[in-house]
């Protein structure tokens, strides 16, 4: 193939899964003339974005980080969740030199080990089993002061589901005969990723100085008091549990989230000497600050599980073959369409340009369900018309970010906004003879109520995701595709042989 249609646009509809059930399905309820027309007239099917198909444990729902890694890598990427869980099972976790070194340094001086992390069985940013293993490791190595600073979920889990996790950790500490939960705060504060530093400062001050709006005798009592204030898990305000615990000089702090994007801001507050995003009342001289994984090459903190390198991911391979590419998203998903899609690489490849559209500054995205998708689309249409790029990769955050709010009516509006944006891209491509692949990284917005509890469903799902080809070729969509097959499909459309490292295979078959 000597020339290929230009550009090829990969449209990633974040959190946009496929469910046969119409119940509380925002996609089913929305008015989507473009999506309906494409499914009626273009080759389409479903591909898997969860579990073993994306390198997660069997049955585990997909997520944005994992989805974009697989989409860009063209192979199944075994995730940090899986790596850490396996290390715990095999016993290697308890011999990890980064973790044991940090604990030993603090314990030998009679200092405390502070464990930070999302206390959840959601498996998206963390897993409570990993926090339990860390408490066990600290106790085994002689630490007497072990404190868990628990961030509550309610986003990748039901909105009020923290009680069982707290009970599990309380039981763990009782069994160990040492350690306790020292503080509670919702992930809304501790795990911001959009430079809302007022939220992060609340978490930092709680952990470091035990500065809290509320106090409680036990973690369960603190949780029940938050529920009485109408705060779901995600939004629980800073709560000190029992006697005040401060992070002192010589203590070790270990952040047990395995996913990077929502661990960066709080980590920066602990380790950056010239940090100026908010005034730190105190910066303890720690024996160690450890991340379970590498949160960023720019954050000076050792990682217990260092990143494994991925060679010949789509972006790198396009650059090697002289192709130009554009990556575009709004703030909430910018890291996904750049860092994660590039296999954990921060810098652009040669011939790669990036456009970041700031996400709207609203408390929660149900207040502006269209987010800034129209502005993202303006820039894509402009790039298509200019025909400067061979490949454009775009992420639309709406399905996921509005899906996470649990507000059904807002989710319907988000889907309708997406439909309009996709229509504009398809129209622009038609004028220049370009092509598109439309897919998603995981499900979310197609299930907005938990059938078992009747609560709002704010988490991701394990549903398959759509895959639609937009263009003039005579092709069909094969069954059994996974996210790792998308990059090889794109290379086929571009007339490029896939590299040996890509084990995925094209989803499109010549008709």
From Swiss-Prot:
It catalyses: (2R)-2-phosphoglycerate = (2R)-3-phosphoglycerate. One of its GO terms (cellular component) is cytosol. Mn(2+) 2 binds at residues 14, 64, 441-442. Signal peptide: none annotated. It comes from the Bacteria. Its cofactor is Mn(2+). Binds 2 manganese ions per subunit. GO terms for molecular function: manganese ion binding; phosphoglycerate mutase activity. It is an enzyme of class 5 (isomerase). GO terms for biological process: glucose catabolic process; glycolytic process. Mn(2+) 1 binds at residues 400, 404, 460. SUPFAM superfamilies: 2,3-Bisphosphoglycerate-independent phosphoglycerate mutase, substrate-binding domain, Alkaline phosphatase-like. Keywords: Glycolysis, Isomerase, Manganese, Metal-binding. Pathway: Carbohydrate degradation; glycolysis; pyruvate from D-glyceraldehyde 3-phosphate: step 3/5. Substrate binds at residues 125, 155-156, 187, 193, 259-262, 333. The active site is at 64 (phosphoserine intermediate). Its EC number is 5.4.2.12. The keyword tRNA-binding does not apply. NCBIfam families: pgm_bpd_ind. Monomer. Belongs to the BPG-independent phosphoglycerate mutase family. Catalyzes the interconversion of 2-phosphoglycerate and 3-phosphoglycerate. This is 2,3-bisphosphoglycerate-independent phosphoglycerate mutase. It comes from Pseudomonas entomophila (strain L48). The lineage of its organism: Bacteria, Pseudomonadati, Pseudomonadota, Gammaproteobacteria, Pseudomonadales.
């Amino acid at each position: 193939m000597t020339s290929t249609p230009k550009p090829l646009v990969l449209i990633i509809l974040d959190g946009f899964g496929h469910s046969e059930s119409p119940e509380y399905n925002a996609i089913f309820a929305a008015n989507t003339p473009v999506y309906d027309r494409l499914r009626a007239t273009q080759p389409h099917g479903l591909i898997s974005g969860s579990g073993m198909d994306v390198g997660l444990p069997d049955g585990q729902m997909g997520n944005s980080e994992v989805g974009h890694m697989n989409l860009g890598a063209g192979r199944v990427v075994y995730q940090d969740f899986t790596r850490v869980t396996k290390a715990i099972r095999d016993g290697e976790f308890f011999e990890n030199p980064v973790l044991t070194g940090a604990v030993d340094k603090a314990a030998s001086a009679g200092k405390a080990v502070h464990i930070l992390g999302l206390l959840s069985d959601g498996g998206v940013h963390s897993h409570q089993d990993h926090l339990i293993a860390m408490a066990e490791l600290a106790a085994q190595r002689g630490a007497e002061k072990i404190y868990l600073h628990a961030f509550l979920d309610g986003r990748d889990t039901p909105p009020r589901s923290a009680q069982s996790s707290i009970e599990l950790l309380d039981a763990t500490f009782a069994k160990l005969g040492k350690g306790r939960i020292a503080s509670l705060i919702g992930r809304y504060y501790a795990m911001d990723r959009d430079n809302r530093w007022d939220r992060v400062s609340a978490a930092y001050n709680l952990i470091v100085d035990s500065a809290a709006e509320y106090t409680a005798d036990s973690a369960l009592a603190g949780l029940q008091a938050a529920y009485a204030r109408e705060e779901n898990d995600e939004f629980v305000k800073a709560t000190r549990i029992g006697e005040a615990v401060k992070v002192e000089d010589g203590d070790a702090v270990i952040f047990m989230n395995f996913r990077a994007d929502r661990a960066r801001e709080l980590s920066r507050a602990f380790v950056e000497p010239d940090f100026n995003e908010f005034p730190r009342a105190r910066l303890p001289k720690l024996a160690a600050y450890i991340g379970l994984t590498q949160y960023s090459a720019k954050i000076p903190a050792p990682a217990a599980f260092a990143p494994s390198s991925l060679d010949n991911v789509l972006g790198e391979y396009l650059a090697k073959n002289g192709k130009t590419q554009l990556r575009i998203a709004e703030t909430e998903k910018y890291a996904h369409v750049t860092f994660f899609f590039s296999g954990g690489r921060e810098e652009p490849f040669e011939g790669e340009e990036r456009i970041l559209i700031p996400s709207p500054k609203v408390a929660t995205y149900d207040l502006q369900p269209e987010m800034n998708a129209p502005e993202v689309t303006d820039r894509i249409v402009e790039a298509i018309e200019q025909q400067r790029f061979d490949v454009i990769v775009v992420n639309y955050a709406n399905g996921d970010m509005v899906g996470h709010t649990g507000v059904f009516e807002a989710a319907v509006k988000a889907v309708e906004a997406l439909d309009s944006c996709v229509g504009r891209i398809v129209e622009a491509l038609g004028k220049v003879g370009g092509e598109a692949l439309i897919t998603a990284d995981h499900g979310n917005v197609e299930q907005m109520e938990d059938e078992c509890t009747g609560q709002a469903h704010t988490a991701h799902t394990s549903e398959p995701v759509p895959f639609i080809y937009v263009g003039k070729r005579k092709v069909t969509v094969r069954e059994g595709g996974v996210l790792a097959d998308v990059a090889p499909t794109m290379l086929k459309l571009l007339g490029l042989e896939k590299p040996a490292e890509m084990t995925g295979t094209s989803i499109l078959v010549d008709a």
